[in-house]
């Protein structure tokens, strides 16, 4: 078990969302940035957590559904990485995430993934309540346009809204797992 003050949490980068019927904002760039974070975390011996969002057993997002499987480009290391299932927007609700982080001595959670206005937002707001300093990688989370706002507006809004009271913002290229202790 890797012990570290930092952990990387990649949220819901799964087939049915990332490769869904609606285009994501800057999906190629976001994926490259997430892969950079994963590589840097592994080099720094920082634990990497992957959340998979599932729905009811009779839904298209059941646990066994191909739609809930993580995208292969993440190169999940089954022997080292921690993959967990969640049913709610918060990665902490009814999961063992807090226990797993605490067992590894994690004090700071670095967050990336999707969707910005749902699970990324909720987890960023919940993490400090669970005692974690939180870093949101501003160019490593994404969503899609909705009826009222473009995806870029949603992302920009959340970066501004979450910064300060809930998270520290950083970019993937500027973030170093070695620099924060």
Regions from the language model: what does each represent?
Residues 34, 52-55, 88:
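Short glycine-rich, polar/acidic loop-and-turn segments at beta strand-coil junctions
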Residues 21-23, 109:
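Short, basic, glycine/proline-bearing loop/turn elements
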Residues 23-50:
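A short alpha/beta connector and helix-capping loop motif
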Residues 1-7, 61-181:
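Active-site-adjacent betaalpha module
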Residues 43-59, 65:
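Early exported N-terminus immediately downstream of N-terminal targeting peptides
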Residues 16-19:
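Short acidic, Gly/Ser-rich segments with clustered Asp/Glu that frequently serve as metal-coordination loops
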Residues 9-14:
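N-terminal nucleotide-binding beta1-loop-alpha1 segment
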């Amino acid at each position: 078990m890797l012990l570290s003050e930092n952990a990387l949490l990649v949220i819901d980068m799964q087939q049915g969302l990332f490769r869904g019927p609606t285009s994501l904002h800057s999906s190629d760039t976001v994926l490259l940035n997430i892969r950079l974070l994963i590589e840097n975390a592994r080099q720094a011996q920082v634990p990497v957590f992957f959340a998979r969002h599932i729905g009811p057993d009779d839904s298209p997002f059941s646990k066994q559904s191909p739609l809930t499987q993580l995208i292969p480009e993440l190169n999940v290391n089954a022997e080292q990485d921690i993959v967990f299932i969640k049913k709610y927007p918060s990665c902490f609700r009814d999961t063992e995430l807090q226990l797993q982080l605490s067992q590894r001595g994690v004090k700071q959670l670095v967050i990336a993934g999707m969707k910005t206005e749902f699970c990324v937002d909720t987890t960023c707001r919940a993490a400090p309540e669970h005692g974690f300093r939180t870093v949101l990688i501003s160019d490593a989370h994404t969503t899609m346009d909705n009826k009222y706002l473009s995806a870029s507006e949603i992302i920009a809004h959340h970066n501004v809204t979450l910064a300060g009271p809930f998270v520290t913002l950083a970019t993937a290229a500027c973030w170093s797992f070695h620099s924060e202790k």
